[in-house]
């Protein structure tokens, strides 16, 4: 049981590393929290600091979710529910990082990393939803919200594991809730469109 609590703490601290803030500081760019949308995630980094840093932020944020879950699965004897808790801890770390006074990102990329480990097949379906919506309407937020809503259903049909379904439902609900401002902007027509 001690190893489980250590894994939870480690997952949270790894998830809390603010990839976008670190990368933009390393290249001498402005504080991402004070630029663009103010979000620390890959989309805002892409808009403010360019494609390269945006992609690196996406990869880094995804790895923050994937690595703790992979370690929990491959190097420990934790059960499915405990692995789900480790995944949730990494995700919460990104959304509420101790290093930034608990003001973090929306969790999409970190959730992606987690889901890629837990259910890669479901991710393919969710990515199709995301890509179609972004291609059609150019709203990353809309694609993210709808993909988050879809993935628990996809996990249910591809995995059928109650613990994994519960984990994805928990993470997806937070992702959607953390897009509340985007939802408001989508409704009033003021949301920023993605430009390649």
Curated annotation (Swiss-Prot):
Underlying gene: plsY
Biological source species: Syntrophotalea carbinolica (strain DSM 2380 / NBRC 103641 / GraBd1)
InterPro entries documented for this protein: G3P_acylTferase_PlsY
Record-given protein name: Glycerol-3-phosphate acyltransferase
EC code(s) of this entry: 2.3.1.275
Pathway: Lipid metabolism; phospholipid metabolism
Parts forming coiled coils: none
Bilayer-crossing regions: 4-24, 53-73, 78-98, 114-134, 140-160
An individual GO BP term: phospholipid biosynthetic process
Keywords: Cell inner membrane, Cell membrane, Lipid biosynthesis, Lipid metabolism, Membrane, Phospholipid biosynthesis, Phospholipid metabolism, Transferase, Transmembrane, Transmembrane helix
């Amino acid at each position: 049981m001690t190893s489980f609590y250590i894994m939870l703490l480690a997952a949270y601290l790894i998830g809390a590393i603010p990839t976008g803030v670190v990368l933009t500081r390393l290249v001498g760019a402005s504080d991402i929290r004070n630029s663009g949308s103010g979000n620390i995630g890959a989309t805002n980094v892409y808009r403010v600091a360019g494609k390269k840093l945006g992609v690196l932020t996406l990869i880094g944020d995804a790895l923050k979710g994937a690595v703790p879950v992979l370690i929990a699965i491959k190097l420990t004897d934790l059960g499915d529910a405990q692995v789900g808790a480790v995944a949730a801890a990494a995700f919460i770390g990104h959304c509420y990082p101790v290093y930034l006074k608990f003001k973090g990102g929306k969790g999409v990329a970190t959730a992606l990393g987690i889901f890629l480990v837990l259910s890669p097949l479901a991710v393919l379906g969710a990515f199709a939803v995301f890509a179609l919506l972004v291609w059609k309407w150019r709203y990353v937020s809309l694609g993210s919200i709808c993909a988050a809503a879809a993935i628990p259903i996809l996990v249910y049909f591809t995995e059928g594991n109650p613990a994994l379904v519960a984990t994805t439902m928990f993470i997806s609900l937070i992702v959607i809730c953390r897009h509340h401002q985007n939802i408001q902007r989508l409704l009033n027509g003021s949301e920023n469109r993605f430009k390649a």
